[in-house]
Regions:
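Solvent-exposed, flexible loop/coil segments flanking beta-strands in beta-rich domains
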Residues: 2-49
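Solvent-exposed interaction patches of small proteins and small membrane subunits
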Residues: 44-56, 125-129
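Beta-sandwich interaction modules
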Residues: 13-31, 91-116, 125-130
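Surface-exposed intrinsically disordered loops and tails
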Residues: 54-98
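Intrinsically disordered, low-complexity, compositionally biased regions/tails
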Residues: 8, 17-22, 28, 37, ...
Length: 131
């Protein structure tokens, strides 16, 4: 018997729909209807403070990802961070902070989430595309 996962749903959720390389400062977007699901840093990398990491959040269901801009939410604050409510709720956590250009992601690290746009300020990376 062979055991393993042979699911396109799992594959599509983990970057098997392609990847894109960036070593400049131009914003990049995934194909229509897709998102970036992981970013591997090839050099120390920073993201633009304004729209550097635009997360595909679904805060109604507790799905929030690190990013630079958040236009949600239940506490009435427009641009706060993922999981940064005054106190934890059934769907939202507390204590998260917004990523800005002062946050350096070191070479070799991979971050996971769902982003609709990536705008680097410095460094180089590979972004993986998923559903």
């Amino acid at each position: 018997n062979k055991m393993g996962i042979n699911s396109t749903e799992v594959s599509y959720g983990f970057g098997q729909l392609g990847s894109a390389f960036n070593d400049g400062t131009s914003a990049m977007a995934p194909p229509t209807g897709k998102v970036f699901v992981a970013i591997t840093m090839l050099a120390d990398t920073t993201f633009d403070t304004s729209a550097g990491l635009v997360a595909d959040n679904d805060s109604d269901n507790g799905l929030e990802y690190i990013g630079t801009v958040f236009a949600r939410d239940t506490d009435g604050v427009v641009n706060d961070a993922a999981h940064d409510e005054p106190s934890s709720t059934a769907t939202l956590g507390s204590g998260g902070t917004v990523v800005d250009v002062n946050n350096t992601f070191p070479k070799g690290i991979t971050i996971y989430g769902r982003w609709t746009s990536i705008n680097p300020a410095s460094g180089s990376f590979i972004a993986y595309i998923g559903n």
